[in-house]
UniProtKB/Swiss-Prot annotation:
InterPro entries: ARFGAP/RecO, DNA_rep/recomb_RecO_N, NA-bd_OB-fold, RecO, RecO_C. Belongs to the RecO family. It holds the Pfam family RecO_N. The gene is recO. Disulfide bonds: none annotated. GO terms for biological process: DNA recombination; double-strand break repair. This is DNA repair protein RecO. Gene3D superfamilies: Nucleic acid-binding proteins (2.40.50.140), Recombination protein O, C-terminal domain (1.20.1440.120), Recombination protein O, zinc-binding domain (6.20.220.20). Keywords: DNA damage, DNA recombination, DNA repair. GO terms for cellular component: bacterial nucleoid. Involved in DNA repair and RecF pathway recombination. It comes from Porphyromonas gingivalis (strain ATCC BAA-308 / W83).
Amino acid sequence: MIIVSRAIVLHNTAYNDSYSIAHLFSRESGRVSYLIPRSSKRGKSGGSLRLLISPLNELEITAEHKQHRDLHFIKEAKLCSLHGRIQSDPVRNSIALFLAEFLYLILRLPEADTNLYDFVAFSIDKLEEMDGPMANFHLAFLFRLLVPLGLIPDLQFGGSVIPRWFDPADGRFVPNAPAHGRGIPPHQSTYLQLFSRITFDNMKAFRLSRAERRQVLDYLVDYYRFHLPPFPLLKTPDILSTLFD
């Protein structure tokens, strides 16, 4: 079956001497894996295709999908838009690598989700186009991503004015520390309501130290880890921590 779709590059790994495997998030088919020629000798389009397979590149692809196969072939591909600033700016590029790694871990199903796809594509365009401080971009992305994923926590205190523990497993405030030992303590959980309002447009108003930003990121990732297992350790947060004061 021939499909035509927009698709976002998540990850590319070596497969054998002839091919690598590119993992793409397709608007029409969800996550799909493709064999990418490692040498232009395997076809006149192999070399150009290989150059397009870069994290968070959005492509328009024509691909051949065969039933009962996990690996497919891309017949034609072109960039939907040029993200020159993401490629050339170290800060944007580091954020892009984090987003790509994160999405690679959580987007696993070969099922179309157009709302989710459109949000991710919109976010990539924002990363390319925005000016000014970018230190909170990844936090705004993770908070806003909860909506299309259907993982929005209940951030109401339930009538209580006393700060309470937040249980990431249940996604709600609780009176006591959760038994699993990974709850967010009261003196920090109150910030969740504040940060739940963060967007790409207002993120510059959220002033955080490097340590505070990393703490918020760790709490967010842990929330995802509870709700989308299995969730291995991320490699890119340490890179982000070195960039922003």
